[in-house]
Amino acid sequence: MGKTSKRFQELLKKVEQDKIYNLSEAIDTVKTLASAKFNETVEIALKLNVDPRHADQMVRGSVVLPAGTGKVVRVAVIAKDAKADEAKAAGADIVGADDLVEDIQKGIMNFDVLIATPNLMGLVGKVGRILGPKGLMPNPKTGTVTMDVAQAVNNAKSGQVNFRVDKQGNIHAGLGKVNFTKEQLNENISTFIKAINKHKPATAKGRYVKNASLSLTMSPSVTLDTQEVMDLK
């Protein structure tokens, strides 16, 4: 633990604690904070001025990052007949129906994203209690309940990121890897923020974004200019 703390203390010296960074400066800074033995993820944290206890203030959706996430995503699809064929042709890793649900019931879930056609959501409901806590339950708002399974598979493979505000009004997301170019990270982060702004509830009052920061998996965070964040449309 001491070694980790010393490493973290060294990284803290590279961050001006009281400074508000614009997005360009923030990306430059976090790229200098890479210190782990793996390719760290660039993460964003947003504190929104919403109350998710009210249905009309829930912020939830998905967005495809232009430069991808840098991760290999395994996609499973619950579909039958022609839709199953479409999913396979689109590159889905696992395609099934009753057999796939049985595997899930046994705890066999070798996938990162689950897509289902609307007519089979009754079947998916049998394993809702297993999928829900893992964040794998298909949902129309994230484009994972759809008849266009080919597009959904393509989105997932291309770098789709799902977001959902938590009970405290926070949203966290990984938006690429530290070895991405500055341009790739800027494009990904800007695209994500625009999606968050697009989903601003009509009933939200005051400043929509209260706090925003950027960090790596194992680094301190840098504070983003919330006005610049809110101005990204």
From Swiss-Prot:
Q: Which PROSITE patterns does this chain map to?
A: RIBOSOMAL_L1
* InterPro entries membership: Ribosom_uL1_bac-type, Ribosomal_uL1, Ribosomal_uL1-like, Ribosomal_uL1/biogenesis, Ribosomal_uL1_3-a/b-sand, Ribosomal_uL1_CS
Keywords from UniProt, A to Z, are: Repressor, Ribonucleoprotein, Ribosomal protein, RNA-binding, rRNA-binding, Translation regulation, tRNA-binding
Which PANTHER family does this chain map to?
54S RIBOSOMAL PROTEIN L1, MITOCHONDRIAL, LARGE RIBOSOMAL SUBUNIT PROTEIN UL1M
Q: Which NCBIfam families match?
A: rplA_bact
Family to which the UniProt record says this protein belongs: Belongs to the universal ribosomal protein uL1 family.
Name assigned to this protein = Large ribosomal subunit protein uL1
Which species does this protein come from?
Campylobacter concisus (strain 13826)
